[in-house]
C-alpha cells in the first residue's frame, strides 16, 4: 500500500474542510440573511410552476424595459413592488434611486445593451445571467442579478455580482 505524501494529505484535508464548510453554509442559507422587510413582501413555502414562470417573465420584462428600452419609470410602474431593497454597495435603496441610476447610466452609455443569457427561478427568487455591453466594441461584463419578488410578482429586492469579460482567458470557454 502506497502512503500519500504530505502535499496529497494537505490537499485531501483542504477538500474535506471545504466540503464541510460548504455543507454547513448551505444548511444555514435559509436563516443567514432574512429580508430586511421582515419577509412581509416575500413568499413563504412552495410556489406553483405558474408563479415561478410569472416571476421569471416579470424580471426579464423589468430589466429589458428599464435598460434596453430605456424606460425605467415604466419598468418600476409595472414590475416594482412597494419597497426596493438594494444590496449593491454602490447603489441606494428605493426605486427613485434605481430610476436615477438607469437614467444616468443609459445617458452616459446610449448604446448600452443587456443580453440576458439565462433565467433561473425558484419560488420568489429569480436569477439572471447577462452580458452587458456599453457599445458594440465593448467586451462588456458578465452579470448575475438576483431578484426577490413579492406575492404579486413585483420586484422588491436585488443583489448582483459583476465581472469584466477579459481580453484573454486561461480556457477556450466563454463566460456565457
What do the PLM-derived regions correspond to, one by one?
Residues 112-114, 139-145:
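Short, surface-exposed coil-to-beta transition loops
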Residues 59, 75-76, 84, 98, ...:
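Hydrophobic pocket/interface hotspot
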Residues 26-65, 69-78, 172-176:
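Short, low-complexity N-terminal intrinsically disordered segments enriched in polar/charged residues
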Residues 59, 121-132:
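A short hydrophobic beta-strand element
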Residues 144-174:
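Short beta-strand edge/turn micro-motifs at domain boundaries
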Residues 12-21:
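Bacterial N-terminal signal peptides
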Residues 72-122:
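A solvent-exposed, acidic/Ser-Thr-rich amphipathic alpha-helical stretch
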Residues 2-12:
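Bacterial N-terminal signal peptides that target proteins for export
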Amino acid at each position: 500500500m502506497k502512503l500519500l505524501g504530505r502535499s496529497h494529505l494537505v490537499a485531501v484535508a483542504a477538500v474535506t474542510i471545504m466540503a464541510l464548510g460548504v455543507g454547513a453554509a448551505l444548511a444555514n442559507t435559509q436563516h443567514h440573511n432574512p429580508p430586511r422587510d421582515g419577509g412581509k413582501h416575500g413568499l413563504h413555502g412552495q410556489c406553483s410552476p405558474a408563479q415561478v414562470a410569472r416571476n421569471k417573465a416579470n424580471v426579464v420584462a423589468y430589466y429589458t424595459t428599464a435598460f434596453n428600452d430605456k424606460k425605467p419609470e415604466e419598468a418600476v410602474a409595472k414590475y416594482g413592488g412597494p419597497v426596493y431593497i438594494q444590496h449593491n454597495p454602490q447603489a441606494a435603496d428605493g426605486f427613485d434611486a434605481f430610476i436615477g441610476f438607469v437614467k444616468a447610466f443609459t445617458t452616459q452609455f446610449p448604446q448600452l445593451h443587456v443580453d440576458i443569457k439565462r433565467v433561473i427561478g425558484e419560488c420568489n427568487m429569480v436569477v439572471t445571467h447577462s452580458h452587458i455591453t456599453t457599445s458594440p466594441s465593448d467586451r462588456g461584463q458578465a452579470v448575475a442579478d438576483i431578484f426577490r419578488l413579492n406575492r404579486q410578482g413585483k420586484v422588491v429586492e436585488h443583489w448582483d455580482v459583476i465581472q469584466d469579460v477579459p481580453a484573454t482567458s486561461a480556457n477556450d470557454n466563454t463566460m456565457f
